[in-house]
Amino acid sequence: MEFRRILQKRSKGFSLIEMIAAMVLVSILVPGISLIVHGTMMNIAFTNMAVFANMEADYAQRNFIKHINGVKSFSVTDGDLTVDKLTFTSYLEDAEYQYEIDDSRQIKYSINAPPAGILLQNVVKDTTFDAVNYVSKFTYKDRNNNNLSVPVASYTGTNVAFNSGAKSIAVPSGNSFADFVAGNIITISGSTSNNGTFTIASLTNDNTIVVSESITTEGAGDAITVSTEVHGVELTFFLLRGESFYKYTTFATIDKNQLDI
């Protein structure tokens, strides 16, 4: 008779020491893994916010550039060209566009008349955080890309005199040229001998402009207008996404001015 021996394989469990060692190892690794996972998820969230903010900003900037490229003229009405309002007429059927950065944290624009459509939301209009000032605004530029202190600075009077030796344009009193700054391109009209465009080299005071180009001596008498002209607009805006500020700046000028420069 043959006998077969049946071998049984018995599993052996963890010893107490091994179990304690495993528990200690897990307690060390789990917090570190949690921090890694948490950090990864936060990075993904911040990246997504930045991507979506860039997409929204790109859409707004492309619209803004397209509209400014088609400008026929900027409004000369008081209050229509400010840091938070921009009004202009387009070559497209002479439509009037108006952009506004309003107090409801939106950038809106309308064509010909209200209501205005929303271009961007959650825009920081003017706030200070950690001693840093965040301001969304329109900045107006002349032909030399210099900032205009006032979008359309202008003075008209019969007391404007020209001096060829000093290359100066002067009025006797007041603050007639207070809104003009060095570097601005000015347009003179109504003059007998000095109509045209000139570059402001300096301002002796609020009553005297010195230009870079030659001028002809001419006494007061004619009704002469000295004015600046907007050739481009810079739009700066801050988007608030989560707890982060995202800054965007874009500059646009009308197509005709780009060809003239």
Question: Where on the chain are the PLM-derived regions?
Answer:
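Short, exposed beta-strand/loop patches in secreted or surface proteins that constitute
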Residues: 72-81, 98-100, 127-129, 153-164, ...
